[in-house]
Amino acid sequence: MKLNDLSPAPGSRREKHRPGRGIGSGLGKTGGRGHKGQSSRSGGTIAPGFEGGQQPLHRRLPKFGFVSLKAMDRAEVRLSELAKVEGDIVTVQSLKDANVINQNVQRVKIMLSGEVTRAVTIKGIAATKGARAAIEAAGGKFEE
């Protein structure tokens, strides 16, 4: 017996549907499309969101909100992510070098999430009150 001799057991695999290949298949003649109408024609699909000429939902509802450009150059960092930074001094550049934040980020804020395992010095990075307390409790300090 070789690999090219192997075949599935009879009846274990069903044949795929081939619409329009005879009435015995159950999908002959109309091929599962029904009789007449737009969806029976070739190319008879409608665009997503089209509601038959009625004003679509996305145009009935008012516009709202905007995309803040500030979000593009700001980032939040968890306490647990500070462990990825090598050395005792954490700056925006050291976070970029450790792939914790994107290269286009300019301002960072440290959030209280996770734990600090070692004393680190934070330079030029903002922090929440809880994160600041946790870093200082671990022996770390902040420098502006």
From Swiss-Prot:
Disordered as annotated region, ranges: 1-57
Any single Pfam family the record assigns to this protein: Ribosomal_L27A
The UniProt record lists the keyword RNA-binding: yes
GO-annotated molecular function: rRNA binding; structural constituent of ribosome
Record key words, sorted: Ribonucleoprotein, Ribosomal protein, RNA-binding, rRNA-binding
Gene3D superfamilies for the chain: 3.100.10.10
Annotated Gly residues bias: 21-31
NCBIfam families to which the protein is assigned, alphabetical: rplO_bact
Family, per entry: Belongs to the universal ribosomal protein uL15 family.
Self-association and partners: Part of the 50S ribosomal subunit.
Name of this protein: Large ribosomal subunit protein uL15
